[in-house]
Every structure is written in C-alpha cells, then in structure tokens.
C-alpha cells in the first residue's frame, strides 16, 4: 500500500499527517462507493492516481491558503482533498456545494472524520453566491464545459475589483471549450499540465468579464 501511495503522490509535498487523513478518506470513500455512485466504478481501482492525486495538484497550484468554493463536489474531488490539505495551514476554508442529499451526507462524514477545513452546502450551484457571497478561489472537476463553468463563477468573478481565481480540471478537448468560451467571456488564462494525464490540464482563470455586444 505504501509503495503504491508514494508512487501515486509522485513527489508532491504532502505531510505525514495529511497522508494519514487522505488514507482515511480513501477508506471511507471505498465504503460509501458501494452504495452511492460517487465516481465511475471503472476508476475505483485507480483511486489514488485518478482522483486523489488529481485533486492534490490543484491545491498545490494555489500560492496561499484561501477561502475556496468547490462546485458540484460530488465524491469530494477536489473539494474534500483541498480541505484536508488546508488542515496543514492556520487559515483557509472550503465551501462544498452539492445538491444531491446522499452525496452531501457523505461529504459531511468525510469532513468530520478527517478534521478537514470545510462546510457542506446542500444547495444548487445557482443558489451558492447568495449563501457564500465572497471567495478567493473556485474549483470544479468533471462538472460542465468551460462556458457553463464561467457562468456559474460569474457572480463571484465579474464584480468590480474581484480577485477571485478559478481552477478547472479539463481533458484532451480543452482547447475546443476555450474557443467556445471566449465568444462570451474575456479572461486571463494559464494552462497547467496535469501530473496525472499527459493530455489533460488544469485551467486557471482570472479577471473574468462578459463580452459586450
């Protein structure tokens, strides 16, 4: 187990205490996944690399602890993993937005049992800005295409003087999504190569605004 874990972490800087919390989360996840569809069943055998490592890389792209909003948190990737990683810091908090009650119940258990820094909001994404009016960072994974993700993020990112940044995991067709999104929005974009899949990226978006006709 330890050898495969070290291989999965691939040299990322993670403390022993955080690794123990991640191991406990993985155990909880496998248990709950037997009765709730948290991720594609075909990926369960590669949980550490496909899901946990993929989430850790996002947290490590952020230079400082932040108040995060994780949209469509589902099985906890990347929201719970980010909240666990924030346990190493003295600040920062993750708001996990998940409207599915069964998944929200799992997320609450995962946060509680790993002493992670987060809160679950069992609401629709469109309702989240009213409940969480400000944030420093937004994340989403396997949720929607880039144009729709930017629509979700607009209430936080298009307000005057907003410094909110967003991180989105994207697969091989990410450039097509970017080309579509730029017809509706202007934004600064950084493409981070994925440490998990060679043809995938993490898109970092900042300075979002709507295009005027």
Swiss-Prot record:
- Recorded protein name is Ribosomal RNA small subunit methyltransferase G
Tell me yes or no: is Mitochondrion among this UniProt entry's keywords.
no
List of residues binding S-adenosyl-L-methionine: 72, 77, 125-126, 141
Q: Name one GO molecular function term.
A: rRNA (guanine-N7-)-methyltransferase activity
What reaction(s) does this enzyme catalyze? Answer: guanosine(527) in 16S rRNA + S-adenosyl-L-methionine = N(7)-methylguanosine(527) in 16S rRNA + S-adenosyl-L-homocysteine
Q: Which family does it belong to?
A: Belongs to the methyltransferase superfamily. RNA methyltransferase RsmG family.
Is rRNA processing included in the keywords of this UniProt record? Answer: yes
The subcellular localization recorded is:
Cytoplasm
Q: Where does this chain mainly localize?
A: cytoplasm
Alphabetically ordered keywords of this record: Cytoplasm, Methyltransferase, rRNA processing, S-adenosyl-L-methionine, Transferase
Cellular component, GO annotation: cytosol
Q: What is its EC number?
A: 2.1.1.170
What biological function has been recorded for the protein in this entry? Answer: Specifically methylates the N7 position of guanine in position 527 of 16S rRNA.
Pfam families xref list = GidB
What is its EC class? transferase
Q: Which InterPro entries match?
A: rRNA_ssu_MeTfrase_G, SAM-dependent_MTases_sf
């Amino acid at each position: 187990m330890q050898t495969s874990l070290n291989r999965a972490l691939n040299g990322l800087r993670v403390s022993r205490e955080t690794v123990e919390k991640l191991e406990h989360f993985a155990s909880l996840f496998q248990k709950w996944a037997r009765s709730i569809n948290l991720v594609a069943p075909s990926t369960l055998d590669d949980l550490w690399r496909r899901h946990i490592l993929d989430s850790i890389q996002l947290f490590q792209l952020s230079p400082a602890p932040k108040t995060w909003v994780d949209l469509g948190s589902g099985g906890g990737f990347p929201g719970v993993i980010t909240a666990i990683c924030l346990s190493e810091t003295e600040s920062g908090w993750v708001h996990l937005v998940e409207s599915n009650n069964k998944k929200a119940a799992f997320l609450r258990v995962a946060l509680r049992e790993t002493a992670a820094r987060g809160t679950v909001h069992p609401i629709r994404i469109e309702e989240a800005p009213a409940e969480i009016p400000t944030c420093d960072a937004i994340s989403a994974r396997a949720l929607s295409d880039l144009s729709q993700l930017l629509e979700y993020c607009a209430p936080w990112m298009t307000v005057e003087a907003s410094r909110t940044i967003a991180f989105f995991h994207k697969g091989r067709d990410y450039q097509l999504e970017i080309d579509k999104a730029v017809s509706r929005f202007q934004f600064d974009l950084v493409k981070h190569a994925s440490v998990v899949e060679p043809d995938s990226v993490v898109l970092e978006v900042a300075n979002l605004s709507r295009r005027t006709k």
